[in-house]
Amino acid sequence: MKNAKRVIIPVVIVLVVLLALNSCKDTLGAVIDQATGKADTVQEEDTTQWAEPTSDPLSLEGIGDPSAKYAAAAVNSCLNIVFNGIWSRQTDYFTAPNGVITITGYGTAEGTQKYKIALWRKVDGGAQYVDGSTYYIKTDGQNYRCSIGGLDPAASYRLTISYDSSRYYIYGGLKVEGIAG
C-alpha cells in the first residue's frame, strides 16, 4: 500500500498540472500572439485627448474672489474661471465667433491625476455634446492648453468641467479664449 501511494500521488499531481495547462493553453497562446504581434484581434485605440503642457503664464482677470468655490468672468473675449473644491461645473453659454476656442488651464486634486473639460452645444430642449471636444488636464499644478475648432459661430456653447470620481475635489482655473457673450 505504501508503494502504491508513492506512485499514485505523483501521477495524480501530474494529471492535475496537465489539466490546468490544457485549460490555459488558449489564454497562453493569445498572450504569446499579442506579445509577438501575431494576434488576430485588434486592440481598441486609446482616443483620450490630453491638453498639451505650456509654459505661458495664466492670468485670470475679472475674478473677484479667487478662493471662491466657483467663479467666472467674461473679459476681453475670454471666459476666466476658478474652481475650488468642486466635483463638476458647467459655464454659462457663450459663442465662438471665429469657430475656434483655445483653453488654457491648470488643476490640483486630492486624489485624482486629471480632470476633463468638454464642450456642449445648445439645442432645443437642452444641450448636445460636441464630438471630439473632451480634453484631459493633468492635476499637477502646471499649465496646459488645447484648442477646439470647427465650431459654428452662430451657435451657443457651454463648457463642462468634471472628473471621473465623486470621492475627491478638484481645484484650478481655466481661460477660454475666442468667445463672445
Located regions from the model:
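Short, surface-exposed beta-strand/strand-loop-strand elements in extracellular ectodomains
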Residues: 113-126
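Solvent-exposed serine/threonine-rich low-complexity stretches and specific carbohydrate-binding patches
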Residues: 128-141
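Edge beta-strands of jelly-roll/beta-sandwich modules across compartments, strongly enriched
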Residues: 113-115, 157, 165-180
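N-terminal prepro-regions of secreted/extracellular proteins
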Residues: 1-90
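Exposed aromatic-hydrophobic patches
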Residues: 142-150
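Noncatalytic modules at the cell exterior or secretory-pathway interfaces
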Residues: 101-103, 149-166
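Short, surface-exposed binding/anchoring microloops in extracellular/periplasmic proteins
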Residues: 78-115
